[in-house]
Amino acid sequence: ALFNEWMLGMGALYIKKQLPAVATLFTTHATSIGRSIAGNNKALYAYMDGYNGDQMAGELNMEAKHSLEKQTALHVDCFTTVSDITARECKQLLDKAPDIVTPNGFEPNFVPSDKEYDKKRMAARRDLLNVAEKLLGCPISPDAFLVSTSGRYEYRNKGIDVFIEAMNRVRTSGRLQREVVAFIMVPAWVRDARADLKEVIDKNIRTTSPMQMPFVTHWLNQMEQDKVLNYISHAGFTNSATDKLKIIFVPCYLDGHDGILNKPYYDLLIGMDATVYPSYYE
């Protein structure tokens, strides 16, 4: 029986106790306390050897998660993780080195063949540019440079703040010759797809002025508290027609049924010219 991440730790421990004939495997892609250390602006990697997982769990109010994760790692038949970096973290913070490292990867057929690749890339670019034009109320060059970041909504750990700041520096550098559209594809607390944006997309209505909040494709709960939108505003982005660089927040799971782009994540990712993942915490 295979269990992934601390949330399923109770299941692993239950099977271990009640059905000892069934082998148990526990895989972690990170540690809850490591993520918390990094998310609280502490230097995780520079001082890794000095951290005590139990002590930090108490300091950061993480005892329950950390305890479950640690006990699961200690008592399953086989404990695995996905990288050498995380293996070091597990050994230091959970007091248990993984029995084996199973590196993350993709199947050989993950990237489409040449003709299929070109077809999917063109379709993705068409849809991304169409959404941008409808939201911003201005034409976007077909040759625009599309760049994105994505991942869990961990504002600092995943470098979302770094991505926005980098885009802002590029925007204000005065050196841009080519139009750039930057997408932040990070699931947030979504309320629903924007009805105004959905309508103009579905009816193929040409918009000539930016929509309200021309930075986001879906309405959020408590938008005024969203870190991404607040930093975009603080940085001075306007997404006006004269800006060489526009930034758009796509705050939903791209499962093909989000109401706006309606394509799975990987079918959109293929349309990007560059992707940026300035992650601090793996």
Specify the residue positions occupied by each region the protein language model found.
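Catalytic cores of nucleotide-sugar-dependent glycosyltransferases that transfer UDP/GDP/TDP-activated
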Residues: 1-282
